[in-house]
Structures are given as structure tokens and as C-alpha cells.
Amino acid sequence: MAIKLKLRNKKGEFKTYYQEFVPYRKRLDYLKEEAEITDEYEKFVQQLPVDNNGKPIIPTAEYTDYELKLANFRAEFVANLFDDKAVTKDAILDGMEPSDATDEIMNIIMYDVLGYKKEDEDEEAPK
């Protein structure tokens, strides 16, 4: 199983990077760190006032901070999967289209690192 990541460099040229091996420890590291980020956010949300439906009223800035923290963590995590030092968090953030970045990063994490299969998601999707 090789992980593939296509990035655009500062000259506008594309380069595809491959990583042949990812240790199981990376899976565990991802699960732990994402849980810590999410738990921190959930603790914050529990302290917020709620609306008439009992849903927390989350300030936009706070939610955006959470999304940014999670997105930066995921970009850094994917960069650290690669042995090639050219693959960095900044290279990922600067070398991918916004419309593709989230899907590409999450595909690497979900399928290559965590081991989910696309068929698993298809079975869970409502029909």
C-alpha cells in the first residue's frame, strides 16, 4: 500500500509524492490527538448557553478556531507520514486546491492510516 499525494510547488508545477510504509503507531497517534482536540472543544461547548431547542449557541469565531486547529493538525499529520522532507504542512497547505484538500487529506487519513474501506462507508450510507 503506497500513499500518494500530489502537490503544486511555488513554480506551479505538480509533483506526486509516495510513501510506501506507514507504521501502525501513526494510526494510534492520530486517534489520540484527534480525540484530544475534539474533547477540548466538547468541554468548551458544554459550558455555552443553549437555544430554545437545547442546542449550544456556539460563537462563530470559536467554531472556526476549532476547525482551523483540526485542519492544521490533519495537514501536519499527513505531512509527517512522508519520509520526503519536501512534504511539509506548509507544502500541503500551499500546494493543494481548497476544493480538493479536505477530501484528499481525509482520504489518506481514513483509508490509508485508519484502514477504513470505502465499501464500509457505502454500506452505512442511508439508501
Question: What residue ranges belong to the model's regions?
Answer:
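C-terminal charged interaction modules
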Residues: 79-127
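Short N-terminal mixed-charge amphipathic segments
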Residues: 1-68
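Alpha-helix-centered segments that form part of catalytic cores
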Residues: 67-77
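Detector for Asparagine
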Residues: 9, 52-53, 72, 80, ...
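Alpha-helical structural motif
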Residues: 20, 73-74, 101
